[in-house]
Curated annotation (Swiss-Prot):
InterPro entries associated with the record: HCP/CODH (IPR004137), Hydroxylam_reduct (IPR010048), Prismane-like_a/b-sand (IPR016099), Prismane-like_sf (IPR011254), Prismane_a-bundle (IPR016100)
Residues the record lists as binding [4Fe-4S] cluster: C5, C8, C17, C23
The protein's name in its UniProt record: Hydroxylamine reductase
Keywords: 4Fe-4S, Cytoplasm, Iron, Iron-sulfur, Metal-binding, Oxidoreductase
Note on cofactor: Binds 1 [4Fe-4S] cluster.
Family of this protein: Belongs to the HCP family.
Keyword DNA-binding: no
Lineage per the UniProt record: Bacteria, Bacillati, Bacillota, Clostridia, Eubacteriales
GO MF: 4 iron, 4 sulfur cluster binding; hydroxylamine reductase activity; metal ion binding; peroxidase activity
NCBIfam families to which the protein is assigned, alphabetical: hybrid_clust, PRK05290.1
Function: Catalyzes the reduction of hydroxylamine to form NH(3) and H(2)O.
């Protein structure tokens, strides 16, 4: 076994990748990611001490966010990048340690190897990385809870990173991330670990609320919008991922250049924000969910900007047109450097590249509708409440989450098609691509698929549910006519799940498979306490959700 990773839904055999990631990452990159997380735990140990002593270093929180974000699925495949990050991590960790010593803060009690180990050469990194991975925790249940928490924190870091880019921060979130990381190094009881995992859900709600505030105060509340999925005849740039700050700067820099901009996958949600609608060269959305990019990036013809995950190892036919930025990296791809001294990123190279390219090849035409975030949906609250009271809407189905390659995910398309006509789907994330182009009709003018936006906009779905609970004067969110049938893929879906559990949501169905990182005993706890379940057949599940089983 040259690596071990089981953080995503597509992990080999639903057990773990041991020689190469299904995602495409090599074993050495997987191991270096483990080592980076290990050293970041050491940083966290010292920085919590520094916080207690009133010593503040603003660089630390950003570094931890970046490091965690770089290790999520389909973000960073670069060996060289992780080697550089590990060197920086050791340097930062030791600088915090030195500052503590200088300020006469007692650190003799710190004995953890992750706070003390020093490596200089790549060979030392690789040797150490082989010893600090997931399987270094021998007890299966302890390992399961530690990894569940770690993946939740990774998702949290991604959302905090986007908010940070827009100038929004919450120190309590940063402190929790560090405390949670340190907790994975301590010999805690199972009950204590479960408590921290559930606390992670609380901060998951907080970080999604922070990002929602950042996005809406910066770009306006998402509006119900018809989005063009066809093409024009101009050269263009395709922007993928989730980072709206990158979107803003790209639109500003392409204005007046003759280069159009299209969104891809979860960046579709940018079409819903009022601030972006003023750009005439912002055409619409091209393609589908992330996993189809091998074909769609080729047919797009122009350059592609990957702002965050999900990147698939690119094919030679279009590799020279893919640019990365932020936490994303892949050997051989051009990388656009981060902002410095308060200035915008420089997108001039990708813009000039676009001018030399043919216009996108049409792969579909027409429009799709989205923008049903909490502000837009709550403006329809009276209409929705009336529809529920009259029986026009029998039930809502939250089908947020991720899409992926597995054929078993066709379940979600089939499920959407088979739902009775008096039901409405609430969605967010790229899971929507399984049904957002189906003609499922409407109920009294309310579309039967209400897309709130990106995966973090699952927060909107929670806000909507809580508002409906208030309107209907219910004591418990689970009394609402809402069922949760969520598809997951990576670590941002984990923090969304933990956030829902914190809000008291029960009987969530999770698929297409339950996470490999849930040991039988941990899965049993989630089933018994929260009613977590997997998926069955479409017919059986619909009967179960509608109380007809």
């Amino acid at each position: 076994m040259s690596m071990f990773c089981y953080q995503c839904q597509e992990t080999a055999g639903c057990k773990g990748c041991t020689s190469r990631g299904v995602c495409g990452k090599t074993s050495d990159v997987a191991n270096l990611q483990d080592l980076l997380i290990y050293v970041v735990k050491g940083i966290s140990i010292y920085d919590l001490k520094a916080e207690e002593a009133g010593i503040k270093n603003n660089e630390v929180n950003k570094f931890i966010m970046d490091a965690l974000f770089s290790t999520i699925t389909n973000a960073n495949f670069s060996r060289e990048d992780f080697i550089a990050r590990i060197k920086d991590a050791i340097g930062l960790r030791d600088s915090i340690k030195d500052e503590l010593v200088k300020n006469n803060v007692q650190i003799d009690d710190i004995k953890d190897d992750c706070a003390l180990w020093k490596g200089i050469s790549v060979e030392e990194f690789e040797a150490k990385a082989a010893t600090v991975g997931i399987l270094a925790t021998e007890n299966e249940d302890v390992r399961s809870l530690r990894e569940l928490l770690t993946y939740g924190i990774k998702g949290m870091a991604a959302y905090a990173h986007h908010a940070y880019n827009l100038g929004y921060e919450n120190e309590e979130i940063y402190t929790f991330m560090k405390k949670a990381l340190v907790s994975t190094r301590n010999a805690l009881s199972v009950d204590e670990m479960i408590g921290i995992v559930l606390e992670c859900g609380k901060f998951g709600v907080d970080v999604m609320a922070l990002l929602d505030k950042a996005n809406t105060e910066t770009y306006g509340n998402p509006e119900i919008t018809k989005v063009n999925i066809g093409v024009r005849n101009n050269p263009a740039i395709l922007i993928s991922g989730h980072d709206l700050k990158d979107m803003e700067e790209l639109l500003k820099q392409t204005e007046g250049t003759g280069v159009d901009v299209y969104t891809h996958s979860e960046m579709l949600a940018a079409n819903y924000y009022p601030e972006f609608k003023k750009y005439d060269h912002f055409v619409g959305n091209y393609g589908n969910a992330w996993w189809k990019q091998n074909e769609e990036f080729k047919s797009f013809n122009g350059p592609i900007l990957m702002t965050t995950n999900c990147l698939v190892p690119p094919k030679e036919s279009y590799k020279d047109r893919v640019y990365t930025t932020g936490a994303v990296a892949f050997e051989g791809l051009k990388h656009i450097e981060d902002r410095k001294d308060g200035k915008a990123k420089d997108f001039s190279e990708i813009i000039e590249h676009a001018k030399r390219c043919a216009s996108p090849m049409e792969i579909e035409k027409g429009e799709i509708v989205g923008g049903f975030a909490h502000n837009a949906v709550l403006s329809l609250a009276d209409k929705i409440v009336d529809a529920v009271k009259t029986g026009a809407i029998r039930r809502f189905f939250v089908m947020a989450g991720c899409d992926g390659r597995a054929k078993s995910r066709n379940y979600y398309s089939d499920f959407a098609k088979a739902l009775p006509k008096d039901t409405v789907i609430l969605t967010a994330g790229c899971a929507k691509y399984k049904y957002n182009k189906l003609d499922l009709g409407d109920i009294g003018g309310i579309p039967r698929v209400l897309d709130a936006g990106q995966c973090n906009d699952s927060y909107s779905l929670a806000v909507i549910a809580l508002k409906l609970k208030e309107v209907f004067e219910l004591q418990d969110i689970n009394e609402l006519p809402i069922s949760f049938n969520i598809s997951w893929y990576e670590q941002k879906a984990v923090i969304v799940l933990l956030a829902l559990l914190h809000l008291g949501v029960k009987n969530i169905h999770l698929g297409p498979t339950l996470p490999a990182f849930l040991s039988p005993n941990v899965a049993k706890v989630l089933v018994e306490n929260f009613g977590i379940a997997g998926i069955g057949t479409v017919e059986d599940d619909i009967k179960l959700f509608l109380g007809e089983a």
